[in-house]
Amino acid sequence: MKKKILSIICFILASSMLLFTVGCGGEANETVEATDTQAQTEKKTKKEKKTETGKKTDMNMTPGQTKTDETLTERIYDFSVPNNCFRLIGRTKSTGSGLIFDHAVSAIEFQGFMTGDVILNVTSNKESYFTVYVDGERVDTRFGASGSKGLTIASFEGNYFHVIRIVRQNEVAWSQCLLRSLKMTGYLFEAPEERDLYIEFYGDSLTSAFGNIGDPSDPAPHDVPKYQDATQSYAFLTTEALNADCSILAMSGVGIATGHYEKHFLHYFSQFCHKRSNAKFEFEGARVPDIAVVRLGANDFSVGCTKEQYVSRAKELVDYIREGYKKDVPIIWMHGSRGGDFNNWLKELSDYYGGEAGGFYLLELGWRDHGVGAGGHPNVASHVANSESLLAFIADKKLIK
């Protein structure tokens, strides 16, 4: 009898040591909704939390090719625990609950030896969508999450070195998202280095890419993020072509002075995330952009705006950027063609900062010359064309040293 009881106890103990993972994959170009994960595996007491330290990276390692003969074990990287394994890009922030992942093209990047499934645990109050890059290549699958979910963002065979980047597709207005943890078999190195160039974009739906992947016949209700992919916006495409890091601060309907919201642009984006609290964005310790690109005005004109309102708020934004970062960041002010009066407003604004000699540049371009997506907004082809125009402008003005 004692032997039988002992056998049962041993079986239970052995079973409890196995971690069961739940996730989902998908075919190319399929939108993948997440499955529920065992959140209890992530829960740790404050006493158990300690800083995670990634191993030093061998610069000679090649993603997808360098292999290890080590036996890899399963690990959970808790994002509420400080560590040096993840590179945070844009307005992505570490908190005691996880990584705040609210803004368009917020991103994280990590590298290490991995095998089997790599599962990202996410909590989002509404639909959020993500693009994943593995070893520099964009994965065709679109990943989506709502609630507390787990996403199998990659599956590997063999014990190879890989680099993964996860980028949010939707703007801050649609959902608020926390990255909770990463579960994988293997281990991570120190975070990848920053790219040499960093560009920050300020705008509305034309910059956040609302409607760019929708059908032209669809009215695109403004609470549905499925029509939007900021990783196919002119802003992100431009930075990818330059091998630069990107930050997008943009919201559909917002104006620099008026627009479709009660407040103006700077009221919202001088906060780290206005949907969470009114805590101001802290410039200290933040990465300083090499170029700032502003594209605001469409919503001001759709509801009405005076020259005094527009120019005054535009000056506030430029001063906010330059005084906050303590640097005369070159400003590219993108705009559409709106006639003589508006051109005079822009000339006054440009002259105030000394024009191109003062690092203030005006770029006029169309916004949907190559077709529309949902809600009458530019489709991906139009964003590609805008990106090409912006790249040519940056090269012509020699804005990259």
Residue ranges and their predicted role:
Residues I5-I8, C24-Y202, T207-Y227, K401:
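N-terminal secretory targeting modules
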Residues F201, C246-I248, G359-E364:
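Conserved beta-strand scaffold positions in the cores of enzyme catalytic domains, especially
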Residues L13, M17-L18:
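Hydrophobic core
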Residues Q271-K401:
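Alpha-helical cap/lid subdomain in secreted, periplasmic
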Residues Y198, D245, D328-P330:
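Residues at the starts of beta-strands that form the adenosine-phosphate
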Residues M1-K2:
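N-terminal hydrophobic targeting signals that begin at the initiator methionine
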Residues H103, D218-G304, S337-N343, H377:
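Conserved SGNH/GDSL esterase-like catalytic core that processes O-acyl groups on lipids
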